[in-house]
């Protein structure tokens, strides 16, 4: 039946257009306060960065160390088994030197990507809410600016 084929083609076309219109989440645009560490004081800013990282959903952070030069954190990493199902967990760690940070992007889905000047991803965090993603971004950029000034 020609009418049924037309309806089927329209339905397929509508599904395809809907799928393609989803796209990627957009980066949140805002001006970071690069004096935040100076305004809060270094110990308070370090504690806020630690507290924010502990609330990270992915990766689940278990230990954080913040110095004037770098951010170091340990987290649980799943060991993938057959068909991608995790069979256990191991500890992993990451150290991000503030001088190596080129840019920090926070997205609408609470994902934060920390990139070097060469666009290499230095860290990737997913937070439960936009406030934690914004605070993590602001503090990293403020620590980077403070390190660049010294």
Description of each model-found segment:
Residues 1-12:
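Bacterial N-terminal signal peptides that target proteins for export
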Residues 20-23:
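C-terminal motif of bacterial Sec signal peptides marking the signal peptidase cleavage site
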Residues 25-27:
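Bacterial signal peptide processing site
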Residues 111-118:
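Short aromatic-glycine-(Arg/Gly/Cys) micro-motifs in beta-strand/loop hairpins
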Residues 118-150:
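C-terminal partner/receptor-binding element of secreted or periplasmic proteins
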């Amino acid at each position: 039946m020609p009418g049924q084929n037309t309806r089927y083609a329209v339905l397929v076309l509508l599904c395809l257009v809907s799928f393609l219109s989803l796209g990627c989440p957009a980066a949140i645009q805002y001006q970071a306060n690069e004096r935040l560490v100076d305004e809060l004081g270094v110990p308070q800013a370090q504690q806020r960065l630690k507290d924010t990282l502990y609330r990270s959903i992915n990766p689940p952070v278990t230990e954080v160390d913040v110095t004037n030069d770098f951010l170091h954190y340990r987290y649980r990493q799943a060991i993938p088994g057959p068909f991608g199902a995790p069979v256990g967990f191991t500890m992993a760690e990451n150290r991000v030197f503030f001088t190596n940070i080129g840019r920090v992007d926070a997205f609408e889905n609470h994902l934060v990507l920390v990139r070097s000047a060469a666009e290499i991803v230095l860290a990737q965090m997913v937070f439960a809410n936009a406030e934690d993603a914004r605070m993590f971004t602001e503090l990293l950029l403020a620590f980077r600016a403070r390190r660049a000034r010294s």
